[in-house]
Amino acid sequence: IEDKLQDGVPECISSLRKGGIKVWVLTGDKVDTAINIGYACQVISPDMKVIQLTSNAKGISLEVDKDGIPTQMCLNAVLAKALAEGEKAVKDGLEVVAVLDTYFLTSIEMYGKGQDLLKLANMCKSFIAARVSPDQKGQIVTLVRNNSPDTVVTLAIGDGANDVNMIQK
């Protein structure tokens, strides 16, 4: 079974991004699927710097606990590298997209690194979280809403029961 994008979705998202609106995708899909969808709907463009914080990312040496969650030391190193890459890309005039998976999001929550995640997200034009649970979707929306200036407006849109928690936040 293949999910197809509805007509006009890529153009709509492209217009939102051109208008300065950051688009976040929070999905239960696998990382590769989420990235492919990101390209298909223009959340990611070919000229963007993709910063991937996922358990299968190239160039990331993971030290994980028994549940596959990155350890605090590993998380600190990966976040520091991601922040440095993001800053360099922005300085070089590139747009940035961050791609995270459930394991990194769990580690960020466990070790209280939400502010670092927001710092990275603020550099990004787009943000993709893959393999996330309904609870994690809600936590991400809450994190952004609770730590953004009053001038920031957030909108959560979903098409299934797994999106209810996020939408209610």
Give the ranges of each region predicted by the language model:
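Cytosolic catalytic headpieces and adjacent flexible linkers of membrane translocases
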Residues: 1-151, 155-157, 164
